Amino acid sequence: MALRSSRAQAIGELAQQAHAGGVDRRSFLLRAVALGVSLSTGDAIFRTYSARAFQDESGSPITVTVGGTPIAAMEPDLTNATPGGTLRFGRSTDSDNLDPVTNDGNVNIWYFMSIYDQLVRVAPDGITLEPALAESWEISDDGKTYTFHLREGVTFSDGTPFTADDVIYSWTRAANDPDEHWTFTLTALQRDENGQVKGITAPDANTVVVELAQPWSPFLSDVAMFNMSIISKAFAEGNEETLVESAMGTGPFSLQEWKRGETLTLVKNPNYWEEGLPLLDSVVVSVVPDDNARILQIQGGELDAMMDVPSSRVPELQMDPNLKVYQFPSTLTAYIVLNNRNAPLNDVHARKALQYATDRQTLIDVVLFGVGVPATSFMPQGALFWNDKLTPYAFDIDKAKAEMAQSATPNGFPLELKIRGGSPDEETLATALKDMWSQIGVDVTITPTEGTTLQDDYDNQNFQAMTSYWTNDIIDPDELVAYAILPESSQAFQTGWVNEEAQKLAKDGTAEPDSAKRDEMYRRIQEIYNEESPMLSLFYKPYLDITTTKVHNFGHPPTGQFDWRTTWIEQ
């Protein structure tokens, strides 16, 4: 994470003054412009962060309390842990599908991963694997046979025993389901003449053998992917369509109730296989679309924890003695997804014009208040095979105009930019981009959209441009590369961009056993992606979460899925 620049610090202090009512609009704008912020962006910041924006229903501004301490991520400390209690957690957008196989977004994944387990899971450090439902495994010398030895005595949350049959059912369903969104994890499985998966067998109830059609370097990492979650065969077989809103897994929590648009309630799995865990009795996940409303609720005692903290509020919230502010290391890459299927964004010169017209450091300063790093790749900084030789597109209006002049729309074009409604950060981001891009003739219309609708628009390619982000769910780049480049490997592929060299490298990279050669392949993929610019990678940022001081061991690993196994709350 980069240290905050002096400009970012100055902008942050100015926003805090606006929040406290210590500066009027005119003075704010004059000082913002002096810091290099445009009038319209400065106005957006003022409107978003002025004292009026933070008034409660009575009209009283929130009081900023001095004396709080920011808390960094740490190893779980269970010394004084008190079991029991309910964690009330706030988020901006509801889930829309709890099926590990057919879902397609973090609004689902980050929550149902508390319900389901995989044979192997990503460790809390986000960079290594560890045993889960499989205690151990062997890989044949030719890299085509994997033998998993299952943990004995495990049951699903309803008490049904977990066996190898559940693994075969879950993986076969994932491989054969026509609505599977994440087929890249299953590419190497053997298929019969009808395209149905084969080669997954169970010599006994506690052993699973997988015979691959070809060597597949990321297979063990792929086994930790959410779509490889183990579902109870007894619960789901013949009723798969109900898994959109029901669940039966071996994870630390089970699904008690889902009120669409309101709450998702998870309760402790009494049969969970990790002794003594989870500590909480339940987690109630509430949908509160407006970021500032969630802050009001946590300060008012209605919530215990929340995600998506506006960056500008962090300095203020760190001073609140009743709150803990977390900046968790993440794999989050924020970007603008561009629909490459249609004009004008099917033109690489138009896309590169937007790249050069985007001042990433200014975005970090005015949106994240310095808490972030300019993105150089669609892959997260420091990830396996991340290309550290790439540099961000320099902000250069002359180059942007030159690229636009070579495009089919030399005078620019109108562009609708969809953002998540209720997000101060996204409103400021969009306003800043509108200012920047206007210099090359791009007339941006900003369309705030409710979170679930925004996800639907993304899934159905109903957009020109849209703010978004992604995170690594596994430690191998196989996931993001498939997501970004291979339309047949993931229904989450949304840009419509096609490049034969990149696609060949993506496919060859999974079969290559030599890590050094894979590194070369994935570095080249990133170079091509950077040159073709099917989307605009903006910045890398940490997860910003807050809890009350009564919450302990709040977990948000780099891969994003919340880990509440060891979380506890003072009663």
Locations of regions flagged by a protein language model:
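Aromatic- and charge-enriched surface segment that lines or borders ligand/interaction sites
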Residues: 135-182, 209, 297, 344-346
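N-terminal secretory signal peptides
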Residues: 1-27, 34-36, 49-52
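Detector for C-terminal structural segments
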Residues: 33-48, 107, 259, 268, ...
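Gly/Pro-rich hinge or "lid" segments in bacterial periplasmic/extracellular proteins
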Residues: 123-125, 216, 221-278, 282, ...
